[in-house]
Amino acid sequence: MSLLMAHRKSKSSQRKLRNRSSSLTPQKRRIRASKGSHDTILSIRNETSSLEALSRTIQWTLARYKYHRYLVSLSPRTPSQLPDYVLAANDSLENAMKWQIASISAVGGKIASHNKNTYTSIDQITDYSASLERANAEIRTCMWSFSSASQALFSLARTKGLDAQRRWMQGSLYVANPSISNIILYSKGIASEGDRHPSDVLEVLNRFIFSKFADEELNLLLYYLTFNPLLNVEVASKLSPLLLYFPVVDQYEFLANLFTSDQSLSKPDVLPFGRDFVEILSSTGDWRASPKAALAERVEPSRFTIPLLNRWCGYLLDSIGILDGVSSAPDREFDIALANEFFHQPQSPRAYLASSIFAMKSAQTLADVKSALYKREIANVHFEKVEQQIAPPDQRFIDYSFAAVAAEVGISESVYENRELFRIACICGISEGRTLDTLILLCEYTNADPFGSSYFPADLFSASVTEDEVARIGHDPRVAIGLSRVAASLGDEGQNLVYIAVEQHLNVRGMSKPSEIVADSAVDVAFLREACTSSSLRQSLEFLSKAEMEDERIQVLFNLAQVDPANEDDYIEEVHTIIGQQTIEELLQRFHVGKVQCDEQALSTWALIELSPKFNRLKDFIDAGLPPVEKDADIQFIAHLTSGKSETFTFKVPNNESLDIARTILAELNSKYALDPRYGVDSYLSLGMRHGAVEAHLQSPLSAENILTAKEPLGYPDDCFWTRYFIDNGFECYGEKIGPVLATFSEKFDNKLEAIKNDLLQVRRPDKPEGLIVADWSEASVLSACARFAEVPDFEAFIAEFTLIFWANVEGNLAAAREFIENVLSNELNELLDELEANVRQATGQQRLAPFSDALMRARQELGNAVNDVSTWHNVARSTDVEPLGLVEIISAAQKIVCRLYPDFEPRVTFSGDTGITVTYSLHILIEVFKALFTNVYAHSEVENPAVDVHMAMTVEDALDVEFVSDCNDMGKAERAALDANEKIRTGEYEKKLPKEGGSGLAKVARSTLRDGKPNTVISVDHSTCKFHVKMAFKIIQI
């Protein structure tokens, strides 16, 4: 009986199993047969038309095969289950979205839990503890996702600091095996530190991550997951397939971002399955569902509504400390304050407002603008609903056209709204080809709001407007003014475009130089002040040298000071700056700033350890009366040289063994100083010149003019800047011909630089016979140096003497190196340019090929300057911070500055006292002090050619006294001025009146003579001699 019952139970179980199996859909049977194969479920996805059926299939598969790698990452419970690689690239957007929406539907409850975590209030978060707890709760009860991890990381940094954040990442997030999730979490960690500018985050990621990957789509994925930027369908079609096996929460947020970023998706049926996803937004309690539905019929692609910044945007800006006024700069602090919102929780309505305002600052197309405004409207409608308010009745529709938008710029009470309208107008103007009108708007709007220039779409302008276009419209001075205000954001071509406009305006007025303009309007003044700067004039071929160009700017500034007295101080200050820098450069040119050096301290330490035994052995010979050469032989040798005798001087050698030791010590020292791979001259040549410095310096003039073609793995490409330039401007024949010529030239030029580096920038030795640095000693120098062994008290003293002799020898030989560079090498490089010029003429049939020929001429001039720089590098290095400079020369430099400022000032200057005094530090400060004193003489002496006597003396060990005495005409006035000045210096009133930068008059003197907290400057007059005295005591450590 028991056996029969057992048999019946077995039969019953088999029938139940058959019935359960028979209820499986064909898709589920295929999945079971393949044991959850990825290929099988992907095939089913592609074949299934019903989203609901696919969702049920995924739900069934997840319950049975959830530990398959491609499935476990959809709803990970631990960081190790986050995706460790990317699958399904090159999939279609439709198939990808089908999978994503079906997967999201399969875990709808978890999405609803995630949405409850979103912060939806307009109020700013002041305590992130609750946010941290909500993120951790989502991770514990829902799933791990990069969205929740990002929120947790940001909140943790805000509440417990960066160290706590990093410890959590290292202890709880990073996994041991190589994983894409580690890279994403690292990126998230950088972005979630708080108070980080997005561009700084991007720079870090570029350096350490993006530059390591050749796959552009993978980099795009990392960029998206880090920054959560606004999306459009084109970008989404690349990203969507890469996200298929990421946590479902992240896939959900990706689609939510897409459907609330791309204005074209305002109606749900634009994309396949779009309506299904919008229904998911609503069913899972997403705050974005209701606003999106409300906007479905209100969005119009050809126009937008104003005001752009309503009360919600105003509330956001106010809450993050941004003042909506003209004085408010949209600077780093502005960007960082916005970034804190969307780096914390990008799906929150506050983040939507912040990302919209941030995106408007960088929008380059109308599509970008529409995306930013759509996202903003989503948040606005949400807050209106929460506050139970309706849209303000004064809303108006504005067409996306330059004329319509430009008419609105400047009307709003909100400065940031005007800035956004200005950007939209400029985008419309550039897109419509209204370049002149756009630049006039730029000029006129930034007259009232200088900071508004940062809202100009510089990238779009650079990509759309050519030099020829600027030349065509440059007759209007407002073109040059406007361009000058955005030149920095236009990149390398910015100042060039400014000068093209300047040149065209000058041509229209029949002038060749800006100084010829008689400014009789505010536009003329702005043109000369802002467009005709040194940076702009440097682009001109009108000036033969930098000095001539700067003299032109100085003349322009003097002219401006006459017609614009309200800003006279600014103009004169710039003149001071230019002339002061010129004079300082001239002064510094008299002192070597070279790159030939070594680590004397390290080499001396080596010698004391390694060569002391040999020196001690030599000292034993010397003490025994057997020096290497006869005593005082070096003095006799110098006397012989100065006597003019023709016969050879003979050194007497008392002992050959003693001489051999001395020679060995000198040879080892010389070799170590010259060739030591770590501390010697050759090592520093490698660091300072061979390691790219000379190569880059000589390439730079040609690269700046796009003459050089960069080498690629397969060689030098024919497709270069000038090829594209001529083709784009309708001269295909020139473009196709010039490319190969420049490629050949670039290869020859790079080979020449390689030869310079390998053969010339070397210490000369047997394997480098062409090296320019010659450290070898003549036999007479060796024997003369050997005489010093008997004169020094110890080896340390001899090393010090050897160092002086070594550098004197090298310095003498460097003169030949500089001559070679300035003549032979310079000629060789110019011959390459001559050959290039000839080959371009032959290839194109043009004697002069503008604008390439102009670029080549500029490059040739700058290359000459670069060669001269390389020549000056071939000096023994002397730091101008520590190399003593003559005080007389410093004072003379200050006098020269003032005389160039005021050409009619011709003082008669004499120096007395310790005129040989040299000082070590604060060259610029001392020049400023004496410049102020000479300026006072010019302004107040009332003497045509005043006499000035400067007396200097070292009175005590740490003090330098200088008395500056000058002629004075009105003694009563001078005495009152002296009493007043002394009182102001005593009370510190001069210090209070000093601006943040610079200073003027005797205040500079007083400030520079502080000792024990008090100024050491005394001013007096001598009635008997009609002299004005300024007596100063400088503390040596200060100067």
Curated annotation (Swiss-Prot):
Chain residue ranges for the region called Disordered: 1-38
Q: Which UniProt keywords apply?
A: Plasmid
User: Where do Basic residues bias regions lie?
Assistant: 1-19
Q: What is this protein called?
A: Uncharacterized protein y4jQ
Q: Which organism is it from?
A: Sinorhizobium fredii (strain NBRC 101917 / NGR234)
